[in-house]
């Protein structure tokens, strides 16, 4: 691939580098999702992976979309962690990141191992100057403008200062993706009072309340509890990656549980079936909003490039949604927005030395 990807604000669609070998259903469903994204959203796609496996799948494409293949001989398996990213410089996700670094693609999409993607992206794309750690942001289904959860699993045990930066990442995302002019930021903990929570949460609350730290202001509204995650009270929820990932998986499980309850009710008594039929549409919409195939995945923010991590069991619909999200973030100059939000104090390293 010789030509560079157009700038994000170009009338041409951005080029998305898709890791075709990452995910439980790779490469068939990944390729199908890429074909759908190219056909439905007019974007250019570069699939990274083994040409011998990808070209036969592309041969069935009758849509005529702009899809190319960049050879990658290695892959990071779903059960492998961060070390695999060092051992396999020619993995499909590493090649995708290199395309972005060289300006030949605007964003990366992968459904591979989260730990492997985060490690590879940090190694190949590098963090923005002054950023302590990148954060994983995912949209929660709270209505027309979702609530963003940051961090959803990139850093399990962050420092409090990192959580202030997570707030900046989430604010930039909300502004770019959902047009929220002045996003409200809440800290996820076990009570609304500032003194509630563990040592990490209490210190993070102090720092968020005192922000900005050389960057742009944060509209911090205080603590929120788990019961408020889907209430739409804030636009950005800040937490550590361990808590955030548990919360996200719980919400996903609740969506599946609602679907199973509906199925069970439809097989119950006549009265139960009659009542459920009236609620079926609403329940279907609720389950759809909580479906990982719909929201497109999580954005790994704070790097010199856009990375979207799709759910590991994503099929074609989920991959197409992830490609659309990646294109939207690239068009909205998400990297530059974050760079502006961090401000000179972060870039100068005054906020906290990198750990």
Language-model-detected regions and their locations in the chain:
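Glycine-rich phosphate/diphosphate-binding loop of Rossmann-like nucleotide-binding domains
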Residues: 28-29, 44-46, 51-52, 156-226, ...
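N-terminal phosphate-binding or glycine-rich loops at protein starts, especially the Walker A/P-loop
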Residues: 2-55
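Short, glycine-rich nucleotide/cofactor-binding loops
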Residues: 16-28, 154-164, 309-315
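Phosphate/nucleotide-donor binding subsite
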Residues: 62-105
């Amino acid at each position: 691939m010789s030509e560079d990807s157009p700038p994000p604000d170009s009338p041409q669609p951005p080029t998305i580098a898709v890791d075709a070998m990452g995910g439980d259903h790779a490469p068939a469903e990944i390729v199908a999702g890429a074909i759908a994204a190219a056909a439905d959203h007019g974007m250019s796609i570069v699939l990274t992976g083994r040409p011998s496996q990808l070209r036969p799948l592309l041969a069935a494409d009758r849509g005529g979309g702009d899809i190319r293949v960049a050879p990658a001989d290695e892959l990071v398996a779903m059960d492998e962690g961060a070390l695999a990213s060092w051992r396999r410089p020619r993995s499909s996700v590493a090649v995708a990141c290199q395309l972005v670094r060289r300006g030949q693609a605007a964003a990366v999409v992968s459904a591979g191992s989260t730990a492997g993607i985060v490690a590879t992206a940090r190694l190949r794309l590098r963090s923005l100057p002054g950023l302590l750690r990148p954060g994983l942001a995912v949209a929660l289904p709270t209505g027309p403008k979702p609530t963003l959860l940051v961090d959803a699993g990139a850093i399990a045990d962050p420092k409090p200062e990192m959580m202030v930066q997570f707030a900046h990442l989430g604010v930039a995302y909300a502004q770019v993706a959902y047009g929220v002019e002045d996003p409200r930021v809440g800290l996820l903990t076990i009570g609304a009072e500032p003194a509630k929570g563990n040592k990490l949460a209490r210190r993070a609350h102090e720092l968020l309340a005192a922000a900005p730290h050389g960057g742009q202001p944060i509209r911090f509204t205080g603590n929120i509890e788990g019961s408020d995650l889907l209430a739409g009270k804030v636009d950005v929820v800040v937490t550590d990656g361990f808590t955030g990932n548990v919360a996200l998986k719980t919400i996903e499980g609740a969506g599946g549980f609602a679907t199973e309850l509906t199925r069970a009710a439809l097989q119950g008594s006549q009265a139960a079936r009659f009542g459920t039929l009236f609620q079926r549409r609403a329940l279907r919409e609720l389950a759809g909003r909580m479906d990982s195939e719909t929201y497109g995945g999580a954005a790994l923010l704070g790097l010199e490039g856009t990375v979207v991590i799709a759910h590991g069991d994503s099929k074609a619909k989920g991959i197409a949604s992830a490609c659309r999200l990646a294109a939207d973030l690239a068009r909205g100059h998400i990297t530059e927005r974050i760079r502006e939000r961090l401000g000179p104090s972060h870039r100068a390293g005054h906020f906290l030395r990198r750990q």
